[in-house]
Amino acid sequence: MSEDDTKLMAPPSSFTPELQSESPKSAQISYRFMCPGPGRFQCSSTGLVFVMAQKTELVYKAIQWNESVLQPSGKIPAGLLFKIQCPEDAVCQLHLPHCETKDAEFLKSLLSVVHITDDGMSILKPLEITDTHVIVTVSHFSAFGIVRAFEVFYRFFSNPCPVHGQVLLFLRPPNLNSQRQNLHLVVLSRNVPLEEVRRRHQDSVYIPAPLKCLLFEDQHYTVDCPTAFIVQPKKADFDLDFGPNYHPTFEIRLSTSIKVVTIALRDQKNTDVWKHDVDLTGPGPEGNHIFRHGL
């Protein structure tokens, strides 16, 4: 076995891509990676894994789905649609992250990958589906994305399984006149990259917190926050949302004097599926508000 073959079979090496945007306030970003040579490389921002055959430059970005193109094929989005640019034959395989918790046998009938070019759309049968990724063989690039088989999904809807979800927190600048601040909760599937959401909330401060939870599609959720003046809406359905806007799922209104707040996301049975004590203060010794530190 050659050295290059060994690299192609090795676990992926993580890399942090260079982020590029059209302007400082642009919500559209591209990811750039100078691949050093053959091997497996995983993007720390998107979760994508590229199995590379050669040294090259990779440039990729998430673009908006056109669901009217998918509908005739009986497919619905199950992940972001990525437009990828690189030389032909530079990539052997592409691993796209999914959010499913179902077993591998079921996923074989549920998930596939679409390849969209200027000539139209083709559906690729996965080479393999792991607990985290859908793997396809590729040779040339344009746009790739994971899709679900609509008929298969709703055939088993009476006995649903959860998907891997995440809760992202964004604190709006305080209103000094009313002495109020708004904390936004964005509830999404696990395979939506954080950076894609952050770019849609550039006027807010992202608050790191444990992200992971299990969520059921088309079921409603509520937020409990005892120190809030108001939480709105009172309940919200969870749907797979792959952008491009990523609006807040819940808004929590708080006094600016609040430094720490406990938030719980609850399901229809009033069971906590996610709970966290959120620190709304900055790193200074007096715990000044994070906006006063310019973070």
Give residue spans per PLM region.
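A structural signal for beta-rich interaction modules in eukaryotic proteins
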Residues: 1-111, 115-295
